Amino acid sequence: MVGVRSFRPADRAAVRDISFRTGFMGESAESFWRHKESWADLWTSYYTDQEPEALHVATMDDAVVGYLAGCRNTAGMRPSTEELTKAVIRRHWLLFRPGTAGFLYRGLFDSMRDRERAGGDFIDPHWPAHLHIDLLPAARGTGLGAALMRRWLQQLEEADSPGCHLLTLVENTRARKFFEKSGFRIHGNPTLVGGMRGKRGERLHQQIMVWNLLRG
């Protein structure tokens, strides 16, 4: 049996685990970030702890195999992504950990040389909401991703939200096609992602995509 439902506190560990296991274009983030707890803090703690009503999970035989983490008002996030990132770096001593320091210092170097690069939160009143979505390999191609997306966009429609945005990697073609099929479109030009590299050492690019509520 497969299905989607609202997040429950008991799902927190599974959501954190999935975020790490799918953190690099659907594969494990371990290739560049070898500290699971700090990764999960960065990418899931706001949603599980501050806005759980906007978090939805996908299940197979009652096991959580994916999630969609939403935020209805990015401008109102407390802490903001930048504040959260700084706090997690301090709390876990990430600048001194062998499994994370290289990525962070490479990102700092990239930020000094890149004129156009991926920044912090995208704030625009036309698309105030945002989302992250991650599925384990076994859940892909089952319709669960589409079901999660429909559930989240319906929640935004019921709240009369004007729109939603997301950030994805240009190089993640499967994800981009899924988002386009879900009604998202490209907004603006891609920007370089600091610190991150592809499997062959190439630079990666971030793309903003947006969805608008269609009013009758």
Report each predicted region and the residues it spans.
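A short beta-loop-alpha structural element at the N-terminal edge
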Residues: 3-17
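Conserved GNAT-fold acetyl-CoA-binding loop/helix
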Residues: 24-43, 82-90
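Conserved beta-strand in the GNAT
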Residues: 57, 63-72, 117
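Conserved acyl-donor/pantetheine-binding loop and adjacent beta-alpha core of acyl/acetyltransferases
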Residues: 75-132, 196
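Conserved acetyl-CoA-binding loop-helix of GNAT-fold acetyltransferases
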Residues: 132-133, 141-155, 177-181
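Conserved GNAT acetyl-CoA-binding A-motif
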Residues: 127-129, 156-169
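Active-site rim helix/loop that mediates acceptor-substrate recognition in acyltransferases
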Residues: 32-55, 61, 116
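Conserved catalytic-core motifs of GNAT/GCN5-like acyltransferases
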Residues: 75, 167, 185-201, 207
